[in-house]
Amino acid sequence: MENHMKVVAFERQQQGTGASRRLRNAGKTTGIVYGGEAAPQMIELDHNALWHALKKEAFHSSILDLEVAGKSQRVLLRDVQYHPFRQLVLHVDFQRIDPKKKLHTKVPLHFLNAESSPAVKLSSAVVSHVVTEIEVECLPADLPEFLEVDLSKIEAGQSLHAKDIVLPNGVALTPHVDAENPVVASATIPAGAVSEEAAAGEGETPAA
């Protein structure tokens, strides 16, 4: 991906619970950048800007351009700690990436065409999204923002698995996902619909 979301952060000098509390009171969120050959770097970010960025799907699954003290580095968001009941981000972790090394990360799934599938059109089935993201491995340049799951051919009683997802060139399922091949979507007929069909069958009067 050529375009990267930009994140601006500042070097954080103070550490500890008290310092973190003071930063939160000042509208800041603490964070850390780690990975690669450089030492871990303590940072702080504007809370409001971070809060709005976290609402974007791409912020969680794309390579980010993190600027700290005027220097940019490519990172992935690896962890977010939220306050248990307030709309507050307590801490974020970013991992540096090496453009020449494959990375393992989760990518969102976008489900398409369920309404035109035989399961829905012919059987009035309900298509359930069992998982909403899948873990892949690829070079940073090949990392997709999301993966599309085509449901147009799914029939009632069928499931789609991880290996059914069409992956872009250079992208593969991680070994454990490939081995487990988990279900990502399934089509089932609601119990009520089955009962109605059964009732209709029972209501038919046999020919004399």
Curated annotation (Swiss-Prot):
Q: Give a Pfam family name.
A: Ribosomal_L25p
Task: List, alphabetically, the GO terms of the cellular component aspect.
Answer: cytosolic large ribosomal subunit
Does the entry feature the keyword NAD, yes or no?
Answer: no
- SUPFAM superfamilies hit by this protein: Ribosomal protein L25-like (SSF50715)
Instruction: Write out the GO MF terms.
Output: 5S rRNA binding; structural constituent of ribosome
Name the keywords, alphabetized. Ribonucleoprotein, Ribosomal protein, RNA-binding, rRNA-binding
Give the transmembrane region(s).
Answer: none
Is RNA-binding a UniProt keyword of this protein?
yes
**Could you tell me the Gene Ontology terms of the biological process aspect for this record?**
translation
Annotated function: This is one of the proteins that binds to the 5S RNA in the ribosome where it forms part of the central protuberance.
Q: How does it assemble?
A: Part of the 50S ribosomal subunit; part of the 5S rRNA/L5/L18/L25 subcomplex. Contacts the 5S rRNA. Binds to the 5S rRNA independently of L5 and L18.
Q: Which HAMAP family match?
A: Ribosomal_bL25_CTC
Q: Which family does it belong to?
A: Belongs to the bacterial ribosomal protein bL25 family. CTC subfamily.
Which protein is depicted?
Answer: Large ribosomal subunit protein bL25
Tell me what organism the protein belongs to: Burkholderia thailandensis (strain ATCC 700388 / DSM 13276 / CCUG 48851 / CIP 106301 / E264)
Q: What taxonomic lineage is listed for the species of origin?
A: Bacteria, Pseudomonadati, Pseudomonadota, Betaproteobacteria, Burkholderiales
